[in-house]
Regions:
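Short, charged N-terminal beta->alpha structural module
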Residues: 255-277
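Active-site metal-binding motif and surrounding structural segment of the metallo-beta-lactamase
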Residues: 43, 54-101
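FMN-binding flavodoxin-like domain, especially the glycine-rich phosphate-binding loop
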Residues: 176, 180, 184-219, 223-226, ...
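Short N-terminal or domain-adjacent regulatory/targeting segments
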Residues: 220-248
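Short acidic active-site motifs
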Residues: 87, 290-294
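Active-site neighborhood of phospho(di)ester-bond hydrolases with catalytic His/Asp-centered motifs
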Residues: 48-50, 72-80, 99-103, 164-168, ...
Length: 393
């Protein structure tokens, strides 16, 4: 990714990482990810955030091109997570006269990552919520966004060009060079949000309220494309996601965790029964689908059916993983149907119900499906009852 001209004074100097396979060592990123960084050229020059160590050389090349013969006066640190803050100490050493801008928590974490001497105290500009920094004709106002998704996070608003530098907010998986503006922004933005930030809905809601008071024409996130044009659609997505409301209230996810295929076959039969009743259904085999995609679809749908085999008296691990992730991400406000399978002692429904009881505003259907080895007429009758109940809710 080369230097990106956002305006005459604002440049993107981020880097696409197309060789990474797992973001945060857990989330598949088949089209890579971008680490975004920005430069504002004015009477004074500000760099906004650094990049991951994986992209240091390419980023420094972009930065050198963008700066020309200018020296930066400031490095603004929005977020200390290593995919954005890894090169702070390196940049501070490269430009010894540069000040580093952050809040009190920023510098606590900076010392934890790099030691107390990486950025001397006299080089630190410690800002408070709502304070501003003038660069000349451009002014950055700092808006604290704690727990979106780390405690020190802050976003920056540049008033003359109406640009919000949004930290991880409005980020998206995928290399920028591979993003087609006509493509579906929401798909990988949704997966990014729900798996990275999803736990912190109330904090995102608080940030959205602060942002509503700003006149924003451009959003510059730390991952993914710069957003312009009709920003309302992006804000609407974030409002829905952070409110834990389903995008498609009547859509039903049927997710199965099957050892030898019998539970999966029963789940498919259930899905077909739901479709016959006019429901919109998506099926997921948890043994063949990364959990991040299942989490995303569970949040997108208003209703889910979980079909799981009993395994050593517990849940088959792929289902256990999904429920753990959902609980971690504060999954709530949904209707859930349960299907279990066990040749001699089916326990999965009881165990899944117990997991769901720890989540907020989850309605578990009264009708359950119990399969002993393979579905038969009795199990199909139970499926019919569950299908009737969940479609009616």
């Amino acid at each position: 990714m080369s230097v990106q001209k956002i305006s005459n004074a604002i440049l993107g100097v981020g880097v696409d990482d197309t060789t990474i396979d797992l973001f945060e060592s857990q989330y598949p990123v088949p089209t890579g990810v971008s680490y975004n960084s920005y430069v504002i050229l004015d009477e004074k020059v500000a760099i906004l955030d650094t990049v991951d160590n994986r992209a240091t050389d390419a980023w420094l090349a972009n930065l050198t091109e963008a700066l020309g013969d200018r020296m930066p006066e400031y490095l603004v640190v929005s977020h200390m997570e290593p995919d954005h803050g890894a090169n702070i100490a390196r940049l501070a050493a490269k430009y010894p006269d540069m000040k580093v801008v952050g809040n009190a928590k920023t510098f606590v974490y900076m010392e934890q990552f790099f030691g107390p001497d990486a950025v001397a105290k006299e080089r630190r500009v410690v800002v408070k919520d709502g304070e501003s920094l003038s660069l000349g004709s451009h002014t950055l106002t700092f808006v604290f966004a704690p727990m979106v998704h780390w405690p020190e996070v802050m976003v920056s608003y540049e008033s003359s060009e109406k640009v919000l530098f949004s930290a991880d907010g409005f980020g998206r998986f995928g290399a920028v060079a591979k993003f087609d503006e006509k493509a579906d922004w929401a798909s990988e933005a949704r997966r990014y949000y729900l798996n990275i930030v999803g736990k912190y809905g109330p904090q995102v809601q608080a940030l959205l309220k602060k942002a509503a008071a700003l006149d924003i024409a451009t959003i510059c996130p730390l991952h993914g494309p710069v957003l312009t044009g009709d920003l309302g659609k992006y804000l609407a997505y974030y409002d829905t996601w952070s409110s834990y409301k389903p995008e498609e209230p009547e859509k039903i996810l049927v997710a199965s965790a099957s050892i030898h295929g019998h539970t999966r076959a029963a789940a498919h039969t259930m899905a077909e029964k739901l479709r016959a009743k006019g429901a919109k259904v998506v099926e997921m085999d948890l043994t063949r689908t990364d959990v991040s995609y299942a989490v995303t679809e569970a949040f997108r749908c208003g209703k889910i059916v979980l079909a799981c085999a009993t395994y050593d008296g517990f849940l088959f691990p792929p289902m256990e993983s999904l429920l753990t992730h959902l609980k971690t991400k504060a999954f709530q406000n949904r209707t859930v149907g349960l299907m279990e399978n066990g040749t001699w002692a089916p326990m999965a429904a009881k165990l899944m119900r117990a997991e769901l009881e720890g989540m907020k505003n989850i309605t578990v259907c009264e009708n359950e499906v119990t399969i002993r080895s393979a579905a038969n007429a009795a199990a199909e009758a139970q499926m019919d009852a569950l299908a009737d109940e969940i479609v009616a809710k």
